[in-house]
Amino acid sequence: MTTFKEAVTFKDVAVFFTEEELGLLDPAQRKLYQDVMLENFTNLLSVGHQPFHPFHFLREEKFWMMETATQREGNSGGKTIAEAGPHEDCPCQQIWEQTASDLTQSQDSIINNSHFFEQGDVPSQVEAGLSIIHTGQKPSQNGKCKQSFSDVAIFDPPQQFHSGEKSHTCNECGKSFCYISALRIHQRVHLREKLSKCDMRGKEFSQSSCLQTRERVHTGEKPFKCEQCGKGFRCRAILQVHCKLHTGEKPYICEKCGRAFIHDFQLQKHQIIHTGEKPFKCEICGKSFCLRSSLNRHCMVHTAEKLYKSEECGKGFTDSLDLHKHQIIHTGQKPYNCKECGKSFRWSSYLLIHQRIHSGEKPYRCEECGKGYISKSGLNLHQRVHTGERPYNCKECGKSFSRASSILNHKKLHCRKKPFKCEDCGKRLVHRSFCKDQQGDHNGENSSKCEDCGKRYKRRLNLDIILSLFLNDM
């Protein structure tokens, strides 16, 4: 037989709770504790019969107090299990020894019927096998990994491990495990009851604090206020993120364009702009997006009902935030001001793009010619020069344009609309730029003088034509 110095004891697998800790356990947790402790006894003492149930120290849903390892060392004589009362120290070693004594007959039978011992072992050696739990002897050995075990029940699982057999299946999700102890640990996931439930949406939460935060979405309550600007937030974590806006702390910097961000996930999203990758595609219209969240938001345009409508123009939106942004157009509010020139903007994104004019930053560059732009949309328009793309077609004459603004101006020629009027002569014009040129003709700003003959021309173009003709004659 193979002998090991260290024995597997009840202390190695037992879970100890104080009286205060036991009072905090809910029924599901108590049931889980019972199952785990029962499995611990089974793994170490399973011989097919167990006359003493390890949870006899549960009486009227009150746990008997188990002493710690220090208390066991100093306790020379204690009460028997039957004599110990509730909340009295019941030595774990005493439970161990009495249980092993009760199992002598059944364990002796299994040992005799197993191949614990080699041929030639005498009956006295079999008798010695009854104390294998206390001595730490592990006579059984796995032939594949040479690991030794103290009884047949513990000897079997390693064989299941080598064969890959998973005979223990979870009834909740169907997942299988080699060991029943692993199954017990897995079942703790299902035992975590979701105690908190939202009354509005019916969504369940494992913590009451998460439920309170969720309910504030419906009630509009924002108890956490920023001391700098007074803005309110539903939870403290969002307030902490907001406070970084005032401190200016942006530790995450993009290596390509130098733009800084408060959080690392913001930097990761930003870096997709430089790669140009758009892996998420809408199945309905074919439009592609960099982020899955952007695709999900876009899909609502096709599927979701537009519950939020503008009172001014009746336009519908799927999100209240989009409606709020749209209403700024009707109010004319421009809350975002440039500190350099004082120009105002409706959106913070517009202000950010405008500030690049002052800083000279052009993070978007054309791969064909290297020309830089302050916005992604500007780069997209420029790339049509190289590709020759003209997606905007006039239905009247079939003429194509690369910009939406160009086709809008072109359509005015067909409908004969002349919305712009010269303040000096009253002449109506198609484009605003024509109106400015007309006013320049009246005040003399557009006139150009020839240096050779002194004659003045309304347009610089007319002067250039005359000069070219004069040079050809020479």
Curated annotation (Swiss-Prot):
UniProt GO molecular function: DNA binding; DNA-binding transcription factor activity; zinc ion binding
Keyword hit for Zinc: yes
Subcellular location: Nucleus
GO cellular component, one term: nucleus
Zinc finger feature spans (C2H2-type): 168-190, 196-218, 224-246, 252-274, 280-302, 308-330, 336-358, 364-386, 392-414, 420-442
Annotated region described as KRNB, given as residue ranges: 80-167
Keywords of the record: DNA-binding, Metal-binding, Nucleus, Repeat, Transcription, Transcription regulation, Zinc, Zinc-finger
Domain KRAB per the UniProt entry, residue ranges: 8-76
Top-rank lineage group of the source organism: Eukaryota
Pfam families named among the record's database cross-references: KRAB, zf-C2H2
Function: May be involved in transcriptional regulation.
PANTHER family: ZINC FINGER PROTEIN, ZINC FINGER PROTEIN 771
Family (UniProt): Belongs to the krueppel C2H2-type zinc-finger protein family.
Protein name as catalogued: Zinc finger protein 230
Organism: Homo sapiens (Human)
Gene: ZNF230
